[in-house]
A protein has these predicted regions:
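Mature-chain termini and adjacent capping regions
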Residues: 1-135
Length: 135
């Protein structure tokens, strides 16, 4: 499948297996889901997970279990990642680990923008994040 993220960024969605339920024909349930985002600056982001859902109408992608994402520099690992084309945001949550050229961090939830490389970090229950910055 092909879709658009943020109205002008193309992406492709694929999987090993997929099925559609009659009661919700716009949602495709996938096994070994793989999305490739093509960013304006030429970078390519690969997002993979053991399970996931793709909405053909909204282009939203929901990844579950063993989520891995990378743009070649930044690497993200988590249990869940929601690529919300309808909101122009990536929500990453549950056991999030993010490594990037100048450091690494662990958190419960990160809202990440692949285009700008900005992220907002939060913890459930007001706990502190664990972050390491390398100069």
């Amino acid at each position: 499948y092909k879709g658009l993220y943020d109205l002008d960024k193309p992406f492709t969605v694929g999987s090993e297996k997929a099925y559609i339920l009659n009661e919700n024909p716009n949602v495709i349930y996938m096994t070994n889901m793989h999305v490739i985002l093509y960013l304006r600056d030429g970078r390519v982001v690969n997002i993979l997970s053991d399970k996931g859902q793709y909405n053909k109408e909204t282009y939203d992608c929901l990844f579950e279990k063993n989520v891995r994402a990378s743009d070649g520099e930044t690497k993200i690992f988590a249990e869940n990642l929601d690529l919300l084309a309808t909101k122009n945001i990536v929500e990453i949550y549950n056991n999030v680990s993010l490594t990037y050229p100048t450091g690494s961090l662990k958190a419960d939830k990160i809202d990440y923008n692949f285009e700008t490389k900005y992220f907002k970090v939060s913890m459930f229950d007001e706990q502190k994040i664990k972050m390491k910055v390398i100069k």
